[in-house]
A protein has these predicted regions:
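C-terminal edge and immediately downstream basic/flexible tail or linker adjoining helix-turn-helix-like DNA-binding
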Residues: 2-8, 19, 123, 128-131, ...
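Short, charged helix-capping/linker segments at alpha-helix termini
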Residues: 3-5, 21-30, 40-59, 165, ...
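Arg/Lys-rich amphipathic alpha helix in sigma70-family domain 2
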Residues: 66-73, 83-103, 122, 174
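Short helix-capping/turn signature of helix-turn-helix
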Residues: 34-37, 45-48, 145-152
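Structural recognition of an alpha-helix C-terminal capping motif at a helix-to-coil junction
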Residues: 55-62, 75-87
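Internal acidic/polar
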Residues: 1, 5-13, 98-126, 153
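Sigma70-family region 2
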Residues: 21-22, 48, 61-76, 95-97, ...
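Helix-turn-helix DNA-binding module
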Residues: 131-134, 138-142, 146, 150-167, ...
Length: 192
């Protein structure tokens, strides 16, 4: 039964957390193994660089390990580690923002795309979608990636970013509107 499997996973996670809090450093390996791919994916979705995403994931796990005494027992580890890596990734992006703004000044993202020819393959469509998401303002881009690509719920994204659920919904709504406009040739226009 899926519910039993989930309860078993939750119990293993709780045991690992208790063991780490009790001084067993090896128990932390379970948490790293369970969450590393998704943590790296969250980081990559924000910083868009594989090496940086790997560094940020490692930094997030180190930071979480060093702060385990403050972690509330009985709470799931996932949202906590995702919040840590999101905050670290956003910090990296804040430092990059001024350079990116200078690089993109005066150019409209829509002007760079070739709207005369439709993408021929699924990978080209995926690349167009990825490019459209990348062109969004930072918080819209982060929220869109976490919701649309990573599949996090509004409340989870709110927890990770320290924004309200209403703000998350607003960023997501604006992002969707801009994506519909940029991808109108793929998805049938902007008459929605």
């Amino acid at each position: 039964m899926p519910d039993e499997a989930i309860r078993h996973e939750d119990a293993l996670e709780s045991q690992a957390i208790a063991a780490v809090k009790g001084g067993d450093r090896n128990a932390y390996d379970y948490l790293v193994t369970k969450y590393m791919k998704r943590v790296m994916s969250v980081a990559w979705g924000i910083v868009r660089n594989a090496a940086d995403a790997e560094d940020l994931a490692q930094e997030a796990f180190v930071k979480a390990f060093q702060s385990m005494d403050r972690f509330r027992s009985g709470e799931p580890f996932g949202p906590w580690i995702f919040r840590i890596v999101t905050n670290l990734s956003l910090d990296v992006m804040k430092h990059r923002t001024k350079f990116r703004d200078e690089e993109l000044s005066g150019d409209e993202p829509a002007a760079r795309r070739d709207s005369a020819s439709l993408p021929a393959t699924t990978s080209e469509i995926g690349a167009r979608i990825d490019q459209a998401i990348e062109s969004l303002p930072q918080m819209q881009r982060v929220v869109a990636r976490l919701f649309l690509v990573e599949g996090f719920e509004h409340f989870e994204i709110a927890s990770m970013t320290a924004l309200s659920e209403g703000t998350i919904r607003s960023h997501l709504s604006l992002a969707r509107k801009k994506l519909r406009e940029q991808l109108a040739d793929i998805y049938g226009g902007d008459d929605e």
